[in-house]
């Protein structure tokens, strides 16, 4: 074998001479062989020596192989790992050298010579005998300078340390940690740190821990001791180098056991840890090092169960169960646990636990533990070598880890914080705002019923389902899940004794928040975080950027359109009433007593000033249990009046606010928290006044709500103040059809109190318990464009309620109404309610009245050729109102304003996509489809009552839906209130046949109604629905140029709001954030190229801006 062909031979020949020989060149092969033969003996010795050295190097490299790979490394693996390390060091060196010559960091660096480094080291090491200073070069890795006392601390010779690489002193398993924390680009300058007041308290870099050994004898067993290292960047000018070279100055401090002198005080033996749901350490506090003996890198990535005593490991299952139970609450304490230290002994820890919940997935992301050492270990030297090897039960640990992981995989539905529980994170402990909760202030309170809230993912899924699959398929899917909850909500018996215990101070204060029967209790509103609100704001902005066409109609004109964008605009008049409500929240409430008595209890009813002020401009919900959604504006006003949280008003700025404060990190952090809080408050006000206000309400998706026409012994719900609890009420029963010949004995006792022999409106009608009738405060003229009629001023309402109330049939005695505009919400298109009645949620709770009859006889009748339009936008269901409105008495003003809607019309928002209906129940089929198509129906059939759950009474058949018509009434029926046969004076009204002993019959009737609902198919109803009512959503394509242009305009408007800093503030900001000089602004050209290959007008405008000038400026200069 040719010795020159062996790659282990030292490279004495140049590549030009050796290369052709390796390629097989015959011309040079002879001379080379002659030279090798002449010097064969000497080269053989050199080859053997080099082989031995190479073997020793390979064996040494195998010691530095990563400890994660449990298999014994081969020679090839060790060489590949060494090659990767060399490439990594070269890349770091080249990167730093390319940054230093022209970067801003070179100008900030201070150059030191060796004498200055010696004085610097002696200055800092004299204060602590366990600390030394070591300076090593980033280019060569060798020590440039080391303190004199380092040899004594490391128990080695001075000359030995000066000739070493600093990495040679480290334990092999800590080399990677050392390199990760000493990257030159992330180190602070030493001269910047020396300007600090304290050396250790205000250190700008996070310290790390490594094990360092001393001694130069390879035969002795190395003993590594833990050290705390603080790295800094310096430039050193040495005689051997013509230019200053970058170096790392490290302050190295030896760590002693916390239980040996000088001992850590008992009350300060505290540290924190963080681990995943799989019980794997994520972070360990540096205070744990002298208490446990483990370095942070020893624990991170390992299981916490490995270090617990085998008998204490099952306790972690109970701990995590309690973590899941107390999510969002303050940290809780559990049983003490025994934790193994590095020397093998156990310490007893008193631990408190809390968790962090991901606000999007609603799952526990990690668990935080705060531990305090109760009992110290037997061997106080926690860094001592472990004598006996710990026995590990891998199977038991794995089984417990899987059990805990499965436990924490379930989402959290409680009103939990989206931050660190109660650990003091910004915005995590805000006051909860309840915009949907309402209850009675009674003496007997029960705990609030919990129900699952709708997460953001469910909202996204529902929106995508509507857009992609279609409205009909969405209704069908919701139908399957609506039957079972309906059956569960109708099991409580009806009671009459609890109707008398309501507090008179809460009668009408929060009347608009009545959302269901007494059993449909709602939990308090979850307080969303800044990130959640920001995401929802983006979703709403995306949805509102669409332009939706009008409904397709055949009745008048197929091309008749109505813009839905005006419906989503906030009403300026409503905003004014909101500001008035905010001012009312800060003054004591003055209540005006209404001299009315309940029919049974005789409890006096009072009117809150805040509630009265909202009655004129905000739609009031009925006391009936049919109302599902609350008008967003009203909900916010009442929530502010009832909860301790109030809308933030602009406070007067005091002189203290203008005190000059330096721009420090604390000031920037406080400013960021303040801006986030202001954004959350503004967004909450915006979202509650928008058509999408239902996203922040905890609405039950499948809770059924029923309405009895005359109250059927119903007890209305009243809002309560925060801190009080709710009283459980008996549920209202399903309404039943009543024949026109029914007498007053068939009505519930509540109604008999409302219908005396004189047939006039009793004062108790205005009370919240009189749920039988409620006139709308803003009526609509039945034309293509709805016109508002008058709403009387607020001060005219209160005095009237008793005395000369208008009779039911007296139409000629009422004064005419004025036609002035009033602050009422915008109306939707004229046929929106018809569509929503058929395909969306609620069917109307009274049939389409014939042309010759009106539900309000004293207001006249509607012509046969006109269609009854809608009531205000918050109640999109169809309510027939007359056009020829006659005079009306002033006494009916309060009845109009206190009962905004008919008690059987739910208050809903008419947003373009009807997104608020995603959380509600299935609609019932429409009873008046053909009646709408034919205008007026001469033939009449009796229709049954339907509730919000979509159930129908037994007399209704599916085949009769398309041909159902309304029974005609004679004009004399309008004045037949004296017969007390029905509340509206009509046999075809939705009246409730509830006798005094009718509880059992209603239960039987309700069960049959629900059983029939499950058998019907929604497609049978859709097939019989006229085409003029059906509508399909068509989402048009958005103009990209328009959207980009609008975004650009908004960005330009935001530029004026950028903070302007003075020169002194810029310098102070640069001192806090030193990187701000070296990192330029991002290039706009790359963003434009990544956006689209086609350049639009907006992109061309952006590209024409002077981008180069912006790139040359640092962030400080741009400020």
Curated annotation (Swiss-Prot):
Residues 429-442, 491-515, 989-1001 have a biased composition (Polar residues). Phosphorylation by CSNK1E is weak and appears to require association with PER1 and translocation to the nucleus. Ubiquitinated. Residues 120-187, 259-325 form the PAS domain. A motif (Nuclear export signal 2) lies at residues 913-920. Signal peptide: none annotated. One of its GO terms (biological process) is circadian regulation of gene expression. A motif (Nuclear export signal 3) lies at residues 400-409. A motif (Nuclear localization signal) lies at residues 720-739. The keyword Cytoplasm applies. GO terms for molecular function: kinase binding; transcription cis-regulatory region binding; transcription corepressor binding; ubiquitin protein ligase binding. Pfam families: bHLH_PER, PAS_3, Per3-like_PAS-A, Period_C. The modification Phosphoserine is found at residue 907. It comes from the Eukaryota. Residues 1-48, 419-449, 483-530, 718-744, 878-910, 947-1011 are annotated as: Disordered. Residues 551-750 are annotated as: CSNK1E binding domain. PROSITE patterns: PAS. Residues 885-903 have a biased composition (Basic and acidic residues). One of its GO terms (cellular component) is cytoplasm. It is found in: Cytoplasm; Nucleus. A motif (Nuclear export signal 1) lies at residues 54-63. The keyword Cell division does not apply. Gene3D superfamilies: PAS domain. Originally described as a core component of the circadian clock. The circadian clock, an internal time-keeping system, regulates various physiological processes through the generation of approximately 24 hour circadian rhythms in gene expression, which are translated into rhythms in metabolism and behavior. It is derived from the Latin roots 'circa' (about) and 'diem' (day) and acts as an important regulator of a wide array of physiological functions including metabolism, sleep, body temperature, blood pressure, endocrine, immune, cardiovascular, and renal function. Homodimer. Component of the circadian core oscillator, which includes the CRY proteins, CLOCK or NPAS2, BMAL1 or BMAL2, CSNK1D and/or CSNK1E, TIMELESS and the PER proteins. Interacts directly with PER1, PER2, CRY1, CRY2, and TIMELESS; interaction with CRY1 and CRY2 is weak and not rhythmic. Interacts with FBXW11 and BTRC. This is Period circadian protein homolog 3.
């Amino acid at each position: 074998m040719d010795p020159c062909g062996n790659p282990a031979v030292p490279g004495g020949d140049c590549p030009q001479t050796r290369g052709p020989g390796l390629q097989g060149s015959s011309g040079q092969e002879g001379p080379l062989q002659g030279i090798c033969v002449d010097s064969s003996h000497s080269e053989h010795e050199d080859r053997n020596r080099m082989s031995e050295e190479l073997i020793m190097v390979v064996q040494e490299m195998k010691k530095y192989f990563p400890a994660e790979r449990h298999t014994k490394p081969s020679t090839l693996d060790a060489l590949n790992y060494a090659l990767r390390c060399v490439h990594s060091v070269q890349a770091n060196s080249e990167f730093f050298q390319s940054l230093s010559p022209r970067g801003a960091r070179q100008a900030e660096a201070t150059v030191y010579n060796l004498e200055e480094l010696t004085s610097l080291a002696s200055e800092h090491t004299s204060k602590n005998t366990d600390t030394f200073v070591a300076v090593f070069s980033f280019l060569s890795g060798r020590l440039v300078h080391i303190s004199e006392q380092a040899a004594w601390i490391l128990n080695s010779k001075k000359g030995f340390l000066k000739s070493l690489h600093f990495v040679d002193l480290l334990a092999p398993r800590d080399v990677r940690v050392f390199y990760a924390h000493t990257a030159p680009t992330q180190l602070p300058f030493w001269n910047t740190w020396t300007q600090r007041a304290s050396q250790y308290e205000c250190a700008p870099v996070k310290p790390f821990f490594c094990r360092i050994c001393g001694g130069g004898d390879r035969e002795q067993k190395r003993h590594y001791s833990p050290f705390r290292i603080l790295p800094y960047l310096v430039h050193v000018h040495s005689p051997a180098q013509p230019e200053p070279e970058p170096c790392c100055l490290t302050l190295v401090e030896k760590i002693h056991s916390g239980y040996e002198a000088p001992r850590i005080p008992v009350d300060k033996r505290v540290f924190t840890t963080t681990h995943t749901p799989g019980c794997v350490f994520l972070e360990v506090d540096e205070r744990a090092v002298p208490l446990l003996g483990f370095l942070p890198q020893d624990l991170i990535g390992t299981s916490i169960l490995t270090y617990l005593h085998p008998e204490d490991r099952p306790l972690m299952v109970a701990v995590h169960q309690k973590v899941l139970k107390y999510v969002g609450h303050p940290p809780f304490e559990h049983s003490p646990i025994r934790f193994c230290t590095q020397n093998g002994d156990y310490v007893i820890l008193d631990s408190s636990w809390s968790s962090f919940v991901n606000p999007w997935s609603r799952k526990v992301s990690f668990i935080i533990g705060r531990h305090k050492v109760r009992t110290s270990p037997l061997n106080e030297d926690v860094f001592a070598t472990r004598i006996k090897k710990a026995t590990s039960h891998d199977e038991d640990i794995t089984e417990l880890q899987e059990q805990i992981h499965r436990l924490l995989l379930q989402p959290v539905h409680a009103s939990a914080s989206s931050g660190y529980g109660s650990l003091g994170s910004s915005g995590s402990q805000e006051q909860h705002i309840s915009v949907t909760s309402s209850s009675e202030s009674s003496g007997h309170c029960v705990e609030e019923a919990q129900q699952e809230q709708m997460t953001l993912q469910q909202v996204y899924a529902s929106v995508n389902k509507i857009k992609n699959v279609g409205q009909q398929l969405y209704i069908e899917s919701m139908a399957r899940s609506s039957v079972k909850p309906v059956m569960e909500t109708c099991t409580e018996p009806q009671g009459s004794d609890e109707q008398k215990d309501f507090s008179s101070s809460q009668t009408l204060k929060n009347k608009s928040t009545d959302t269901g029967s007494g059993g449909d209790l709602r939990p308090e509103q979850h307080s969303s975080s800044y990130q959640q609100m920001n995401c929802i704001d983006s979703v709403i902005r995306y949805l509102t950027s669409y332009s939706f066409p009008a409904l397709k109609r055949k009745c008048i004109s197929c091309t008749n359109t109505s813009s839905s964008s005006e419906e989503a605009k906030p009403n300026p008049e409503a905003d004014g009433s909101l500001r008035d409500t905010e001012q009312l929240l800060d003054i004591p409430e003055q209540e005006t007593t209404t001299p009315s008595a309940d029919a049974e209890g005789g409890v006096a009813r009072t009117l809150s000033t805040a509630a009265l002020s909202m009655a004129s401009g905000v739609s009031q919900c009925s006391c009936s249990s049919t109302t599902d959604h609350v008008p967003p504006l009203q909900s916010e006003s009442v929530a502010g009046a009832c909860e301790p949280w109030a809308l933030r008003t602009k406070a007067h700025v005091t002189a203290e606010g203008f005190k000059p404060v330096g721009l420090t990190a604390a000031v920037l952090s406080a400013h960021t928290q303040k801006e986030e809080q202001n954004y959350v408050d503004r967004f909450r006000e915006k979202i509650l006044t928008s058509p999408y206000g239902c996203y922040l309400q905890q609405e039950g998706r499948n809770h059924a709500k029923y309405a009895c026409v005359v109250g059927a012994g119903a007890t209305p719900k009243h809002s309560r103040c925060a801190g009080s609890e709710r009283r459980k009420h008996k549920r209202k029963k399903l309404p039943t059809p009543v024949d026109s010949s029914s007498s007053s004995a068939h009505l519930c006792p509540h109604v008999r109190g409302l219908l005396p022999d004189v047939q006039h409106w009793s004062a108790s009608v205005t009370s919240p318990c009189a749920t039988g009738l409620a006139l709308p405060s803003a009526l609509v003229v039945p034309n293509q464009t709805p016109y508002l009629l008058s709403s009387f001023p607020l001060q005219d309402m209160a005095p009237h309620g008793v005395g000369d109330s208008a009779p039911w049939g007296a139409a000629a005695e009422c004064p005419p109404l004025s036609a002035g505009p009033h602050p009422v919400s915008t109306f939707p298109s004229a046929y929106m309610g018809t569509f929503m009645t058929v395909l969306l949620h609620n069917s109307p709770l009274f049939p389409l009245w014939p042309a010759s009859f009106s539900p309000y006889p004293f207001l006249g009748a509607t012509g046969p050729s006109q269609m009854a339009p809608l009531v205000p936008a918050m109640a999109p269901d169809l309510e027939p109102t007359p056009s020829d409105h006659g005079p009306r008495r002033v006494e009916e003003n309060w009845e109009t304003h206190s009962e905004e809607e008919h008690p059987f019309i739910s208050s809903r928002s008419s947003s373009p996509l009807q997104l608020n209906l995603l959380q509600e129940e299935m609609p019932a089929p429409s009873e008046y489809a053909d009646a709408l198509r034919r205008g007026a129906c001469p033939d009449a059939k009796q229709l049954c009552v339907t509730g919000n759950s979509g159930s129908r009474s037994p007399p209704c058949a599916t085949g009769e839906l398309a041909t159902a018509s309304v029974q005609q009434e004679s004009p004399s029926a309008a004045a037949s209130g004296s017969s007390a046969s029905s509340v509206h004076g009509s046999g075809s009204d939705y009246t409730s046949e509830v006798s005094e002993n009718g509880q059992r019959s209603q239960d039987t009737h309700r069960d049959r109604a629900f059983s029939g609902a499950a058998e019907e198919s929604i497609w049978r109803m859709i097939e019989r629905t006229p085409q003029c009512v059906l509508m399909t959503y068509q989402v048009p394509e958005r103009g990209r140029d328009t959207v980009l242009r609008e975004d650009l305009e908004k960005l330009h408007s935001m530029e004026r709001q950028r903070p302007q800093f003075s020169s002194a503030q810029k310098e102070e900001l640069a001192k806090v954030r030193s990187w701000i000089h070296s990192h330029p602004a991002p290039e706009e050209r790359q963003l434009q190229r990544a956006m689209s290959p086609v350049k639009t007008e907006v992109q061309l405008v952006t590209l024409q801006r002077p981008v180069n000038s912006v790139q040359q400026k640092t962030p400080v200069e741009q400020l």
